[in-house]
Amino acid sequence: MARYIGPVCRQCRREGMKLYLKGERCHSEKCAIEKRNFIPGQHGKDRAKKIVGYGLQLREKQKVRRVYGVLERQFRNAFEKAALQKGITGENLMQNLERRLDSVIYRMGFGTSRAQARQVVRHGHINVNGRKCNIPSALINVGDEITVRETSKNNATILSARDATAHAPAPNWIEVDREGLKGRVQSLPKREDLVQIQLNEQLIVELYSK
């Protein structure tokens, strides 16, 4: 499946909740959910119905995929890796998604959205343990130090994102030095540290276990 390049706010409307895909816009009155909280499309207002069974599992998977901006193939690979790990598969899956470099940069406040954080990583602005890393899907481990490269410390996008997210504290599992544009992963994220939206990862496990 190709990456979605249409209007981002349609994805939130399709899931019926804020997925926080547009940074500061999601916290303003311009948010599409605030203005048109119904399924997009000509007959969107008339299509509301109770979803059960497979449909509920599918919507939960799509919701998480959209939050983290991953393709179906990437998502399935992440699930298969989580299934091989010790512990609860659903929690392993969410933890691995949260440990992606683009997600960590977003959590540190150096991107107002995961999409912007992904762009920051791809453009080569980030070092991991002193070495440049431009792979958004790279998994970050406990003890890893993430820094904005010296040549990028005056980057307008990063500085603007840092200022825009000053009101949002970093999660407990990341120690962030906002002025120094760096941070360190202190522990693995716990279930309560994960995404801002309400979700049931067990439905995803049931979907892929069929």
Swiss-Prot record:
Keyword flag Chaperone: no
CDD domains the UniProt entry points to: S4
Domain S4 RNA-binding: 99-161
Domain of life: Bacteria
UniProt keyword annotation of Transcription present: no
Alphabetized UniProt keyword annotations: Ribonucleoprotein, Ribosomal protein, RNA-binding, rRNA-binding
GO CC, one annotated term: small ribosomal subunit
InterPro entries: Ribosomal_uS4, Ribosomal_uS4_bac-type, Ribosomal_uS4_CS, Ribosomal_uS4_N, S4_RNA-bd, S4_RNA-bd_sf
GO biological process: ribosomal small subunit biogenesis; translation
A GO MF term: rRNA binding
Role this protein plays: One of the primary rRNA binding proteins, it binds directly to 16S rRNA where it nucleates assembly of the body of the 30S subunit. With S5 and S12 plays an important role in translational accuracy.
Xref: HAMAP family: Ribosomal_uS4_B
NCBIfam families for the chain: PRK05327.1, rpsD_bact
Quaternary structure note: Part of the 30S ribosomal subunit. Contacts protein S5. The interaction surface between S4 and S5 is involved in control of translational fidelity.
Family: Belongs to the universal ribosomal protein uS4 family.
Protein name: Small ribosomal subunit protein uS4
Organism: Solibacter usitatus (strain Ellin6076)
Lineage of source species: Bacteria, Pseudomonadati, Acidobacteriota, Terriglobia, Bryobacterales
